[in-house]
Amino acid sequence: MSDLVIDTWGLRKWFGPTLAVADLSLSVRAGEIFGFLGPNGAGKTTSIKMLLSLVHPDGGNGRVLGQPLGDRLTRARVGFLPEHFRFHDCLTARELLRFHGRLYGLSGSDLDMRIDRLLARVDLLEAADRPVRGYSKGMLQRTGLAQALLNDPVLVFLDEPTSGLDPLGRLLVRDIISELRDRGTTVFLNSHLLGEVEATCDRVAFVKQGRTIHEMVLGQSVDFIDLEIRVSPLDACLLEGLSAFGSAISQSTADVVRMRVESEATLPALTRWLVERGANVYGLQLRRKSLEEWFVEVMGEDQRPG
């Protein structure tokens, strides 16, 4: 049995003459925290809506939780926090969650316990019986997150979940996502905050002009590490010898050399070699490429997330 909870091939969507999504081909595994990255207008939100069958594709195909797109029973097992949502602002957070719970077929003490647990988890229990018209943007966002988790979903779509949240609110969302991972829940995360994605996700896909153009596993997709060594004496023989341990070797100052190595496992042998040949090693500094740097490299300098 396949462990894929999302599997799509060639999904396309037109809005009039505009091709919003040209080729959405994705595979997301069970229990994965999957980041969906791209510049504004890349088709990310439209892609999510197609996966949720809120928008019907004009081409291609896909399956969610093993069922074709649009399967009604599948929807009951999925949670969704949209980027833009509108609540009935005359209702309290508790009333809103009760309303959404009934849409899922929940009722009675089970629903009440779920509501109390989620309101406490998103730090809204004290404000639960106030109309949401008086809520701040961050409080509304946390209400939306509670709604997305109300049915105890096996797959959750979070579209800009930290929008409007202060640093403590963003930390709370990150903690909740970690808890979902520990429970085996799959999270499909769309966010322009690359630092949050890098701290949270297992794997990411880059989308540009409606196409999936690159995927990478975070923490494993860096095929090299930049290394800066402060060493003396630094001469031509030493520079030549370093080529046995890495590439892209360049001298930046009188006692600093920069190079690329395949992994940290190279460092012990490299350090021993330097010491054995009589060099004085004053410092070794590793630097991995950040997700933002990968984003700019894949997308182009003019396509920073916004």
Where is each model-derived feature located?
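Structured loop/turn residues at secondary-structure junctions
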Residues: 67, 127, 137, 230, ...
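A short linear hydrophobic-aromatic micro-motif
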Residues: 123, 171, 247-250, 280-285
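Short phosphate-engaging motifs
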Residues: 20, 70, 196, 234-238, ...
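C-terminal coupling/interaction segments
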Residues: 262-306
